[in-house]
């Protein structure tokens, strides 16, 4: 599954009768552009999508590397994108990014926000119209 891309790590996100994979390239500590694929099942067929990140520094995953997709308990198709910001010269000063995953035409995307709360998921649009 997507092995030819030499991904750093892969995070599965099941949503609305589909599954998405969030990943990035193997660049060590350096952030890079996020990649995303989706399929009707884990077995494919897989479709590659453009970089799912939007906003400032989206071309380098907001300065981080994806680490996990956290489902929001009690909310359908609600997920938090989690990423680490590593600082090689100061490893004890690692930072973290948590952003809500949003959907457009049934495809997940991650938009930079300076701040947000879990109330965001009470106002969001559904992952697809066939729920």
Language model feature labels by segment:
Residues 1-131:
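Carbohydrate-active catalytic/glycan-binding domains of CAZyme proteins
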């Amino acid at each position: 599954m997507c092995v030819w891309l030499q991904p750093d790590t892969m995070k599965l996100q099941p949503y609305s009768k589909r599954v998405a994979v969030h990943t990035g390239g193997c660049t060590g500590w350096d952030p890079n552009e996020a990649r995303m694929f989706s399929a009707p099942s884990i077995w494919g067929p897989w479709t590659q999508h453009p970089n799912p990140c939007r906003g400032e520094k989206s071309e380098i995953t907001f300065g981080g590397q994806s680490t996990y997709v956290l489902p929001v308990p009690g909310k359908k198709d609600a997920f938090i994108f989690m990423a680490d910001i590593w600082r090689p010269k100061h490893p004890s000063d690692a930072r973290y990014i948590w952003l809500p995953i949003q959907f457009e035409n049934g495809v997940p995307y991650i938009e930079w926000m300076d701040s947000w709360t879990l109330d965001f998921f009470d106002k969001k649009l559904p992952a697809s119209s066939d729920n």
